Amino acid sequence: MVLLISYDLNGHERPEAYDDVAHVIRTNAISYRKPLYSQWFVETNESCQSWHEKIKAVTDTNDHWFICPVGSTRQGWLPNETWDWLNART
C-alpha cells in the first residue's frame, strides 16, 4: 500500500522538527519518495492510524498532518521518477 503523508509544522522554534518527522518516515517505510517539501509517498504495510501515531509522537499539538491511501486515480505534475515509483506500487 502507498500512503500520502503531508504536514505543516506550525510555530516551531526547533528547526529539527521537520527532521524528526523525516526520520520517522525514513526508518518505518518500506520505501518512499518526497516530491514536495513536506509531502511524502510512503510504501508500507501499516495503516493510516499507525502512521498517525508515529507522527503524533514527534510533533506538537499545533502541528497539522494528513494521511491517506493513494489509489490509481490521480493527477499532478511531479518528477518522472516519482510517477514511475507510484505506478510500480499502485
Model-derived regions: residue spans:
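Short glycine-/aliphatic-rich beta-strand segments at the starts of folded cytosolic domains
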Residues: 1-9
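Short, flexible beta-strand-to-coil junctions
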Residues: 9-12, 70-72
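C-terminal end-helix/capping segment
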Residues: 23, 31-33, 81-85
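C-terminal structural segments of small proteins and small subunits
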Residues: 59-89
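Short amphipathic alpha-helix segments
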Residues: 10-25
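Loop/helix-junction capping segments adjacent to catalytic residues or to phosphate/diphosphate-binding pockets
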Residues: 12-15, 49, 76
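Short, intrinsically disordered low-complexity segments
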Residues: 27-71
